[in-house]
Regions:
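A short loop-to-beta-strand scaffold at the N-terminal edge of the catalytic core in hydrolase folds
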Residues: 6-16
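Catalytic active-site module of serine/aspartate enzymes centered on a nucleophile-bearing elbow/loop
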Residues: 229-265
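Gly/Ala-rich beta-loop-alpha elbow adjacent to hydrolase catalytic centers
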Residues: 92, 96, 100
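Flexible "cap/lid" loop of the alpha/beta hydrolase fold
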Residues: 101, 105, 112-143
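Conserved loop-alpha-helix segment in the C-terminal half of the alpha/beta-hydrolase fold
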Residues: 205-238
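Conserved HGGG/HGGXW glycine-rich cap/lid loop of the alpha/beta-hydrolase fold
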Residues: 15-61
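Active-site loop/oxyanion-hole signature of alpha/beta-hydrolase fold enzymes
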Residues: 40-41, 49-91, 238, 252
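Conserved alpha/beta-hydrolase catalytic His-Asp/Glu region
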Residues: 125-129, 141-199
Length: 265
């Protein structure tokens, strides 16, 4: 990704330029900030920030439990280092989407609006720190060299645009293996977070039959729970990585949402 690269504490980030950010992008588990490059490149003129999550990309990994409150605080640390009046639009995928929801619920001064691409649903109640381990699929990918990882991605997801494959493949080798020596805490219910989010929310999801995490029924639950303006969009034929499975439709929904938010400021 071109533009400006830097660090805030243990976190690595990428900005399109030195100007104030319009949109901040938070990636999913085992991805990196660079995985947002195809989307950012397809939106000329956008002033974007993309952050490597702890233990991912070029970010460091503090020796402490992996919790969504930590991901929230990491994003807040970077955003508050160059605050923008009224906040920025935060776009997240999967783990990054849940992190964005945590951030919007507790730091509204930093978030103007939020886009959630197929976040986990979470679960109600208080969760304890638990041991976890590296998923077999990730270990298998990390054992391959880069060309083989790219080939595996192309074979498994033949509909993805070619420019998605290399950053996806590179990111897998960047996951810090010490991540799995730390404990992990499951997130609270997404509906609980939405009840505390007052800014506009766009939920983009695919089909559960293709691996999507959000069903139409759960999207309806989210709409009922949301404290602020809320819209859910299901992109038929897409799975968990909605933007990779159907980039044109994803970009159309994202661009319309950003234009609407900008028109209100």
């Amino acid at each position: 990704m071109g533009g400006v690269r830097g660090r805030t504490g243990h976190l690595a980030w990428y900005r399109t330029d030195e100007a104030a950010d319009d949109v901040a992008f938070l990636h999913g588990f085992s991805d990196s900030a660079q995985c947002w490059e195809p989307v950012i490149r397809a939106m000329p003129g956008i002033r974007a920030l993309a952050i490597d999550a702890r233990g991912h990309g070029e970010s460091g990994l503090p020796d402490e439990p992996i919790r969504y409150t930590a991901h929230r605080d990491d994003a807040a640390l970077v955003l508050s280092s160059r605050p923008r009046d009224g906040g920025v639009v935060v776009v997240g995928h999967s783990m990054g989407a849940m992190s964005a929801a945590y951030l919007a619920a507790s730091r509204p001064e930093l978030v103007r609006a939020v886009v959630l691409e197929d976040p986990p649903t979470g679960a109600p109640g208080n969760h304890q720190d638990e041991k976890w381990s590296e998923p077999d699929w990730l270990a298998g990918l990390r054992a391959l060299d880069l060309p083989a990882r790219i080939a595996r991605g192309r074979a498994d997801d033949s509909s993805w645009p070619d420019d998605e494959l290399e950053p996806w493949a590179v990111s897998k080798a960047q996951v810090n293996p010490h991540l799995f020596d730390l404990t992990f805490q499951q997130p609270i219910a997404l509906t609980e977070l939405l009840a505390s989010i007052t800014c506009p929310v766009l939920l983009i999801h695919g089909d559960t039959e293709r691996g999507g995490l959000i069903s139409p029924e759960y999207a309806d639950d989210c709409a009922r729970a949301a404290a602020g303006e809320f819209r859910a969009v299901q992109i038929a034929g897409a799975g968990h990585s909605v933007r990779r499975d159907n980039r044109p439709r994803y970009l159309a929904e994202l661009t319309t949402f950003l234009t609407t938010v900008e028109a209100r400021t």
